[in-house]
Regions:
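Alpha/beta-hydrolase fold catalytic core
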Residues: 1-23, 44-47, 86, 120, ...
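Conserved HGGG/HGGXW glycine-rich cap/lid loop of the alpha/beta-hydrolase fold
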Residues: 15-59
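Active-site loop/oxyanion-hole signature of alpha/beta-hydrolase fold enzymes
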Residues: 51-89, 236
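Flexible "cap/lid" loop of the alpha/beta hydrolase fold
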Residues: 98-140
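Conserved alpha/beta-hydrolase catalytic His-Asp/Glu region
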Residues: 123-186
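Short beta-strand/loop motif that positions the catalytic acidic residue
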Residues: 184, 190-192, 196
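Conserved alpha/beta-hydrolase "acid-adjacent" motif
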Residues: 197-203
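Catalytic histidine-centered segment of alpha/beta-hydrolase-like enzymes
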Residues: 222-231
Length: 243
């Protein structure tokens, strides 16, 4: 399904229990809807599921101007208004988690889940594609996503981004949102891997301290894609947190 928001053709999926509370799933940079469906598909009985292809990814068009992270958040908010969603539960991975943090600092949010989410500048040691492909190969249930990753992720995020998306990426990487995070009031769950080389585990402990009502779950030996590497455990933790 598609809608036009802020001059972007926004692709999304909505499924599950329309009478339940809404879970909004936000993927990371260079990814798309498919990377969050392993979570969404397991909550269809009790929750209304909304997954977006963020602007510039998947089947959503690129922004016609350079979007800031705040622009992405405003677009998400307008899209949810169009879908008549109020006070969503937001689950975001990496870049999507950063947008979730900003969303919850501005708009009323039921609960927030951040999966390895950056919030200040971090020096990356290895490419996101290399880590993702390694993770997908190790997890049997996620093998089908390996081809997707090969198609949709370049050797580096920056090199493969178009002019507009490249400038958006630079803005995202350099944006420090610590002061915004201090405004978050909703219950927040953080899930991190100890071997995350994109957003270090030290950042997870720092983020936990910045949010008034936050809890941290750490997966020993897992990477930036810890939520997929321990998918069963992730689902169990989420069920407990979401109630």
């Amino acid at each position: 399904m598609k809608m036009k928001i802020m001059d972007v053709n926004l692709n999304y999926q909505r499924y599950g229990n329309i009478k339940g509370k809404t879970i909004v799933l936000l993927h990371g940079w260079g990814q798309n809807i498919d990377m969050m469906k392993p979570i969404g598909d397991r909550f269809t009985k009790d929750f209304d599921i909304v997954i977006f292809d963020l602007p510039g990814f998947g089947n959503s068009s690129e922004p016609k101007k350079v979007f800031s992270c705040y622009d992405y958040v405003e677009l998400i908010h307008q899209a949810l208004e169009e879908l008549k969603v109020e006070k969503p539960i937001i689950i975001g991975h990496s870049f999507g988690g950063k947008l979730g943090l900003l969303y919850a600092s501005i708009y009323e949010t039921e609960k927030l889940v951040c999966l390895a989410s950056p919030f200040c500048k971090e020096i990356q040691k290895v490419t996101m594609k290399a880590k993702l492909l390694k993770t997908l190969k190790k997890v049997p249930l996620l093998n089908k996503l390996e081809d997707f990753a090969k198609r949709h992720m370049g050797s580096t995020d920056y090199r493969n981004a178009s002019g507009v998306m490249r400038n958006i990426l630079v803005g995202h990487v350099n944006l420090d949102i610590k002061e915004d995070i201090k405004k978050i009031k909703c219950p927040t769950l953080l899930i991190w891997g100890t071997n995350d080389e994109a957003v270090s585990i030290e950042r997870a402990y720092e983020l936990e301290k910045l949010i008034k009502d936050a809890g941290l779950v750490v997966y020993e030996g897992c990477t930036h894609y810890a939520y997929l590497e321990r998918l069963g455990q992730t689902i169990s933790v989420l069920k407990s947190f979401l109630g």
